[in-house]
Amino acid sequence: MTTIDLNSDLGESYGSWVMGNDVAVLDLVSSANIACGFHAGDATVLFKTVRAAHARHVRIGAHIGYNDIAGFGRRNLDVAHDDLVAETIYQIGAIQAAAKASGAVVEYVKPHGALYNTIAVDEAQAAAVIEGIKLVNPELSLMALAGSQIVEQARAAGLQVEQETFADRAYTADGQLVSRKLPGAVLHDPETAARQALAFATGQPITAITGESVLVDANSICVHGDNPQALALVEKIVTTLAAHEVQVSHAR
């Protein structure tokens, strides 16, 4: 049976502000990218989400971002190398402490939003994130955009890399994500997202936003927890994969 990792960005509520339906999503995914307090989340949400993931045997990842909670980490920031190294270490350390207190372990790091997109093309910021990860624990893997430059950069630095695709995002003809600033960039229809996820999982091409067939090789598929349709998308993806004998399972 074919297997694929299904991950979601979770733990992004803070204070009295609630985002997503994390507990229900955790019942369906195999990996949880948990916000570490910089782009979203707070200490209580972080700890509760780690415990909930661990209770469900869901793999735990540090979802690190720019220090930009007002912009939800989706604004590009020109962060100095040493600062970005330190911020990477700080965020991983926060979730590692929550994991230790829960009897769990952090297995990977997945950057968020603008940081994720920047390090896919910017070798300097990518180097800072890689350095921060290695200083904390070189056994942590990096989850990154499939086919992006950081994949080889991180591998050359000795990190294991998990290449990721997105069930709920549209792609360009060259296999890149369509900018969120453009219409149609985010997929809200469960059928469309499930069809795209099945293609990723079985090594088949997807259809780019401009109609071309695009083949994207990856071993993990993401559904954004802040998508209003997140739970419906994940439910449809899981049932569609199962119907085609694809099992949702950890990437490692």
UniProtKB/Swiss-Prot annotation:
Keywords tagged on the record: ATP-binding, Hydrolase, Nucleotide-binding
Catalytic activity: 5-oxo-L-proline + ATP + 2 H2O = L-glutamate + ADP + phosphate + H(+)
Pfam families referenced in this protein's UniProt entry, alphabetically: LamB_YcsF (PF03746)
EC numbers: 3.5.2.9
GO molecular function: 5-oxoprolinase (ATP-hydrolyzing) activity; ATP binding
One GO BP: carbohydrate metabolic process
InterPro entries, sorted: Glyco_hydro/deAcase_b/a-brl, LamB/YcsF/PxpA-like
Top class in the EC scheme: hydrolase
SUPFAM superfamilies found in the cross-reference section: Glycoside hydrolase/deacetylase
Subunit comment: Forms a complex composed of PxpA, PxpB and PxpC.
PANTHER family linked: 5-OXOPROLINASE SUBUNIT A, UNCHARACTERIZED PROTEIN YBGL-RELATED
Protein family membership: Belongs to the LamB/PxpA family.
Function: Catalyzes the cleavage of 5-oxoproline to form L-glutamate coupled to the hydrolysis of ATP to ADP and inorganic phosphate.
Protein name: 5-oxoprolinase subunit A
